[in-house]
């Protein structure tokens, strides 16, 4: 059996992070990059997100969230970037599952912000539309094999650090827009992508767990945003409360 000291330094660091991750557990994490699909049409005012923000984000500086108390949530749609994308080849039952999870994620986030869910536009109503642009289940047996046999993924270490995702793990990407339900004015929009982490899913039957955990991450972050905007009026995400150590762990962990 190889000693930890016999591995190259980058691999040693990842092995140590992996051992920590196995002990404390970890869910989905943010990917390093994401492609814009055109669903939101105008991306000219988007900026790169920082901290716990989405990868790309737009916040209307003139918007006052406190004037809104209700929300309309459109049906979440799926839009693959190419005909050969996992979304295009996905079974109908899985497509319905993703759309349901997406809508439920938005619903839970809005309820955390104490918004009333309605079906008609109004002066105090915001409208939310969202699209799932990527969703791919994990190949769980291969992903978990990398935990018990580090040599399986040693060759992928440098690639994994560079992209933020190891092979065989699940992934989820999407776009969201919040607008005034009457005028259509854009108040907030974001494009983001999250991926699974090694050790977050130990059940070989639960191939969609990485995606489910991605939705949970979005639910928690958007819920935090909506609760804050009801108090401050701004759609800006509250300050990232993670320690520098946790941020480094999230960035480097497989």
Task: Name each model-derived stretch.
Residues 64-131:
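N-terminal segment of the mature soluble domain
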Residues 2-13:
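Bacterial N-terminal signal peptides that target proteins for export
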Residues 59, 86-98, 114-117, 162-163, ...:
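Second-shell loop/turn segments in exported
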Residues 113-182, 202, 253-254:
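Surface-exposed short loop/turn segments
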Residues 22-25:
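C-terminal motif of bacterial Sec signal peptides marking the signal peptidase cleavage site
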Residues 17-18:
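Sec-dependent N-terminal signal peptides
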Residues 80-85, 139-141, 196-200:
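Short acidic/His/Gly/Ser-rich catalytic and metal-binding motifs that mark active-site loops
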Residues 27-59, 163-254:
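C-terminal/domain-edge helix-coil "capping" segments
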């Amino acid at each position: 059996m190889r000693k930890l000291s016999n591995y190259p330094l980058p691999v040693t660091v990842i092995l140590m992070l992996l051992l920590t991750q196995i002990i404390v557990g970890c869910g989905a994490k943010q990917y390093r990059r994401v492609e814009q699909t055109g669903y939101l049409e105008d991306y000219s005012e988007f900026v790169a997100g920082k901290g716990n923000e989405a990868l790309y984000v737009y916040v209307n500086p003139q918007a006052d969230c406190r004037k809104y108390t209700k929300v309309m949530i459109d049906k979440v749609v799926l839009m693959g970037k190419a005909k050969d994308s996992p979304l295009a080849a996905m079974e109908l039952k899985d497509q319905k599952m993703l759309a349901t999870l997406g809508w439920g994620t938005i619903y839970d986030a809005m309820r955390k912000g104490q918004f009333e869910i309605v079906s008609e536009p109004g002066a105090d109503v915001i409208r939310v539309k969202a699209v799932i642009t990527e969703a791919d289940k994990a190949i769980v047996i291969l992903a978990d094999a990398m935990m018990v046999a580090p040599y399986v993924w040693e060759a992928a270490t440098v690639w994994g650090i560079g992209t933020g995702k190891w092979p065989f793990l699940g992934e989820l990407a999407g776009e969201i827009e919040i607008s005034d339900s009457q005028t259509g004015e854009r108040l907030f929009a974001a494009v983001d992508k999250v991926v699974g982490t090694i050790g977050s899913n130990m059940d070989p039957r639960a191939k969609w767990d990485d995606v489910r955990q991605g939705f949970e991450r979005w639910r928690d972050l958007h819920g935090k945003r909506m609760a804050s905007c009801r108090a401050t009026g701004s759609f800006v995400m509250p300050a990232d409360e993670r320690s520098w150590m946790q941020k480094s762990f999230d960035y480097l962990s497989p």
